[in-house]
Amino acid sequence: MEEKELRQDLYECVSLLDVAHFNCCLGNENNAKQQCLEIVKILNRLSKTKAFKEGYHSIIKDISSYTLKFYDSIDKGNHFTYSEKIMWLSSKLYGEFYPPLTVYSHKLDSFHSYLLPIQKVIKEKTDILPLPESLNAHYEQVDIKNWTLDYNALSELYQDLLTNCSFVSSLLSIVELDRKDLLENLISPRQDSSIFKCQLYFNGSSRLVTIDNTLPFLNDSNRNLTINSNENLYWPALVEKAYLKVLGSGYKFEGSNMAIDTYMLTTWIPEIVPINNSKLYDCDDVWENYLSKSVLLGIGTGKLSVELSKKLNFISGHDYLVTSFDPITHTIVLKNPWIENDNSYKRTLTISDQDLHHFKYFYINWNPNAFFKYKFHMTFIYNVKDNTGTHMYQKPQFSLLNPTEDSQNVWLLLEKHLPLKNFSEQLINILIYETQLGDKVIVSNQCIRANKDSSTNSRLMLLKFTMKPKQAYTIVISSTIANTFTLNMYNNISRDFTFTKAKFKYPTTIPTFKDKWTSDNSGGNWSLSTYIDNPQYDIEVKTLPTNIMIGLFSEFKDKFVNFHIFQSDPSGKGHRIRLFDKSKLLVNEKYSMTYQFEDFKSLQPGFYKIVASAFDNNLNGAFELLAIHDSPPNNISITKIHPSLGLFLQKKEFDWNSSNRFKLYFKATQFSSRFTFHLKHYSHINKNTESLSDYRPFIRGSIFDAENSQPIQINEEWNDSLYGLFIDCDIQKPKTYILLVERFESGSGRCKVDIGCNRKFNIL
């Protein structure tokens, strides 16, 4: 067997293995297992050929061993963690497949050059990326014979027509390091071929981007659409092509920055620092590390007018590579990645502190191996949207504990996965709180904040913070748009130091009540007569005192909400409160914006009631009632109380018309009818809500037999409650009765009577 045939078979094996990984994570285990069997079949055939003994023995053996282990793990269902599954499922992008780098053994991974075909073929279907409509260009296959890593040759690379100054600056910064290993890791195989794999870091992993050997060329022009140099050097243009392919717009480049692009090329930790007051960030530390080749540096201009740009020799919205710094004169030498035909902009220029106000960002990429021994990462999906109703406890949260007696520096890097939707609108943030055990933060003011707010619309966000000795923290991720993310953590503690998904402080969570306020039950605050119409719930703590956290979370952005908890008794179970009794309140906090939260310590066995209210009435909006406690699940129950006065309900309204009594005739149609009457006075004609300041007459109500005027229930006490008068009465016989409604003095206004009953009845 010829080597080119062997390489083609190996290429098909690793490609099929990547698809098997993806299918396994997608839940198509049977397909994945079948693909593994196909791989083993091919490898068994290869092992029997002469080629097996000609340098490929270990490669075939390593892939076979890995495939068989992967097959067994599929059967056991334990090959991938949740994070790894999401990472693999993030491989599909713009209809293309970009698998993570797979390590088969300590000597072999999927980027190895022997796992790519070597034959040069004329392809009918080329890897064509979109081109700018304004340019007359075409694609050609190129012979790539110059694979030099020589500094002098690569340092002449430049950007021409394509506006990707960030990428060219990033590649030039690696060249300035003279790190040939970083350059070699960008593309494979390093020989003339039709197919190449480029290794770029995005979507939480080093990923392999397959491209062909076609590049765009302009018709009737000496200008270039690709990265170029004075040499016949094409391999950097292939890496550029892979980079543009991943971003999705091809040669219609839509922008990036040097820090992000350098991260994609090297995995060096990116930091984007705004330049404020013409001062650079921590110059001494940065330049010391720059001299030791531990950081890569760049700088980006802000928006400049055409006149100012020409005058200063700065390009508007442009990234430059930083090549040196003079600590005495505070001058910085920059390298311009762009060369124009008329050479109106210099390739190298020197700036001073006085020029910094023309620049907007300082780009730093830190070599992780120079500053940290260990890295841990987790990939997850953010399904909810901040600023549109998402509350703190619904956001992804992670628990972190410093196990040492010393302060520890930890860096967190949050990566937003491609593709980017509504890029400029999406803000991301990392919030860190000091917590007792790294438990989930329910509301923002519950715990001490350990970092400052620094949200960004960048695809990457770096947060540096110092952990106190033995202190636990909770990391909260915030985003304005749903997306997939990877959170990376760099540390010097140990390989086993990780963060985990945060859990609630208490172990038992009562199923969340998803409810809503409507025009029927949005009663407003307790100073309104409709307060008792709000949604209400029974709480029963059965035998053990319990610690319980209760939260009310609304969908409102700009409305105040609250919940009140009242002491009750067994006889009140299933019945709604009829007045706001402050003496029975467990807590009486002020209304707060969008949510209310309380952490009750040692709530005693007994019966309680919750009333959920917004400060304003007549609102429409959803809310959730969350309860978490530390007692056994069956020790606490929460049930919603039905809002109706009875199974059957009728209403009657009348005007007082300067009188002080009114007779309402009604007929019970069945035996043993249980009636509840709710009498409400209104002083205003077109207003169905009374407030504390409104006049209310004292009223009372009694029930009589309509046939003989015999009293059924006499109520002698007068009542002027804001929430109205309630009368409960059991009527044994089906016949006609009178509800006599009286007020203390004659007057005006109207009275509304709601009647509820467990059996049918009629108002006459």
UniProtKB/Swiss-Prot annotation:
InterPro entries listed in its UniProt record: Calpain_cysteine_protease, Calpain_domain_III, Calpain_III_sf, PalB/RIM13_Calpain-like, Papain-like_cys_pep_sf, Peptidase_C2_calpain_cat
Domain of life the protein comes from: Eukaryota
Entry EC no(s): 3.4.22.-
First-level EC class: hydrolase
Keyword line: Hydrolase, Protease, Thiol protease
Residue stretches making up the Calpain catalytic domain: 95-368
GO biological process terms on file: proteolysis
GO molecular function: calcium-dependent cysteine-type endopeptidase activity
PROSITE patterns for the chain: CALPAIN_CAT
Family: Belongs to the peptidase C2 family. PalB/RIM13 subfamily.
Function, in words: Required for the proteolytic cleavage of the transcription factor RIM101 in response to alkaline ambient pH.
Alphabetical list of PANTHER family matching this protein: CALPAIN-7
Protein name per UniProt: Calpain-like protease palB/RIM13
Organism: Debaryomyces hansenii (strain ATCC 36239 / CBS 767 / BCRC 21394 / JCM 1990 / NBRC 0083 / IGC 2968)
Organism phylogeny: Eukaryota, Fungi, Dikarya, Ascomycota, Saccharomycotina
